[in-house]
Regions:
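Surface-exposed binding patches on compact interaction domains or structured appendages
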Residues: 25-35, 59-114
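Surface-exposed loops/turns
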Residues: 43-44, 106, 122-124
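Bacterial N-terminal signal peptides that target proteins for export
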Residues: 1-9
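Long, low-complexity ectodomains and other extracytoplasmic segments of secretory-pathway proteins
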Residues: 23-51, 57-60, 137-174
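Bacterial N-terminal signal peptides
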Residues: 8-18
């Protein structure tokens, strides 16, 4: 009887204290980026480059693309809010990539260079979100199905430092 209770207790401990294992499905997109975030400073009329590193943590080769968005901070939390290009957002045109699309194998790191060609009329700050996602998203196989489409973003703050520019902040109320 004691042997039975020990066995039962051991089984109980094993079943309830063992951590669950989550399997990654073959179709899962698992990307890791570095560095986060990136802060660049350059003078108008020059170019500046930075390396973007991405790792495929998935189980299969992934063909990826880089798209450009912009970001701002949510008012209450300060977390980034990604936004699409709007009319007048010409700073999107300043960015080029060494490889806008590429393939990365499982567990492999890939480095892509982003170059910002800053025009002479640029000034102050520009907020980019460089988004890595699948080049061709998988579409649902059957009718009335939905799919979650996503990626991961590297946030880039580009400061165009104008030598004669004057920065001034006024506190209206405290």
């Amino acid at each position: 009887k004691i042997q039975f209770l020990r066995g039962f207790f051991s089984l109980f401990v094993f079943m309830f204290l063992a951590s669950p294992v989550q399997a990654q499905t073959e179709g899962s997109l698992n990307l890791i980026t570095s560095p986060l975030p990136i802060s660049l400073t350059a003078e108008p009329g020059t170019s500046i480059s930075t390396d973007l590193k991405i790792k495929n943590g998935g189980l299969r080769d992934e063909e990826l693309k880089i798209t450009i968005m912009k970001f701002r901070a949510y008012e209450s939390s300060g977390k980034p809010q990604l936004m699409e290009r709007e009319d007048g957002d010409i700073f999107f045109d300043w960015v080029r990539f060494s490889e806008p699309t590429f393939t990365v194998a499982p567990n492999e790191w890939k480095t892509v260079t982003a170059t910002f060609d800053i025009p002479k009329e640029a000034s102050f700050g520009y907020y980019y979100a460089l988004v890595f996602s699948r080049a061709e998203e998988e579409k649902p196989q059957e009718e009335r199905q939905t799919a979650l489409v996503g990626g991961t973003a590297v946030l880039v703050l580009l400061e165009a430092r104008v030598p004669e520019a004057k920065r001034q902040v006024e506190v209206a109320e405290f």
